Amino acid sequence: MDKKSARLRRAARTRHQIRHNGVHRLCVHRTPRHIYAQVIAPNGSEVVAAASTVEVELAKDLKGTGNVDAAVAIGKVIAERAKAKGVSEVAFDRSGFKYHGRVKALADAAREGGLQF
């Protein structure tokens, strides 16, 4: 089993547990160049809020898009957008990535922004 399939297996297991709980989930995806965050409805059919470093308005204020500072900025923005839609409590879906570095920075910034995990 290679690294990617192991990560996807971990992600599927986590998503199944979150869907069983029936709460909104904050889904994070990272690439070497960008980081993405989405708040997804409990049934999985609707994206309630989204933010990423691909967005020109967010990326122009950042020094780089693939670093911890960018993840912190995305965490703050996703918390703000989710709260504007009436979502304050989410389950954190790290998509099989280690809870470390950029993923942890995004989660901490979202908590500081008012989201409860």
UniProtKB/Swiss-Prot annotation:
User: Which is a Gene Ontology cellular component entry for this protein?
Assistant: cytosolic large ribosomal subunit
The entry's keywords: Ribonucleoprotein, Ribosomal protein, RNA-binding, rRNA-binding
Name a GO molecular-function annotation.
Answer: structural constituent of ribosome
InterPro entries xref list: Ribosomal_uL18_bac-type (IPR004389), Ribosomal_uL18_bac/euk (IPR005484)
Q: What does the subunit section of this Swiss-Prot or TrEMBL entry state?
A: Part of the 50S ribosomal subunit; part of the 5S rRNA/L5/L18/L25 subcomplex. Contacts the 5S and 23S rRNAs.
Regarding protein family, the annotation reads: Belongs to the universal ribosomal protein uL18 family.
Q: What does this protein do?
A: This is one of the proteins that bind and probably mediate the attachment of the 5S RNA into the large ribosomal subunit, where it forms part of the central protuberance.
Q: What is this protein called?
A: Large ribosomal subunit protein uL18
Name of encoding gene: rplR
